[in-house]
Amino acid sequence: AMSDSIKALSTEIPATTEEIAAVAEAAGQLGIQKDALLDFTEIMTMLGTATNMTADEAATSLARFANITGMATDNYGRLGSVIVDLGNNFATTESEIVAMGTRLASAGKLAGLTEPEIMALAAAMSSVGIEAEAGGTAMTQTLNAIEKAVAKGGDDLAEFARIAGMSSEEFSSAWKNDAMSALTSFIG
């Protein structure tokens, strides 16, 4: 049963049975499917141990992020590893990365960014002191404007391309094939 699995988990990771059960309960309330519940609970509990987020905060934030991006439940482990790695390598915290990432999720997905790319962009932005609310809004507007310009062509596309040091055709192709590198060229 689930309670046996939770007890077993408490011997593998530094969390009490009660803490793990609370995360499992939250996961159920967040709509995590039963077959993914134990893995999700383990990953979120480990994030609660390895980051500045509690396991509950990690569960709520990442479930919301996954819901916005349509991420498959079997990618939680990989995304958790990405967040810990970014937190270790940027001058920002995991909770700031996730807050910014959630703000960027919808526009990032629309632009064709992967979930790890969205979190990497979030880490880069929050590490230079950009706040999630204002920065997320500004970057969302930028991503949407680029997406619209690439779809329509014309002067707006030419301006984005000029700033990125490319022709309109090059920028349009880069955006469609690797939005993150096109964005990096534009920002850089």
Go through each PLM region and give its residues.
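Short, intrinsically disordered, charge-balanced linker/junction segments flanking boundaries
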Residues: 1, 183-188
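A short, structural motif
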Residues: 1-81, 87-98, 107-116, 128-136, ...
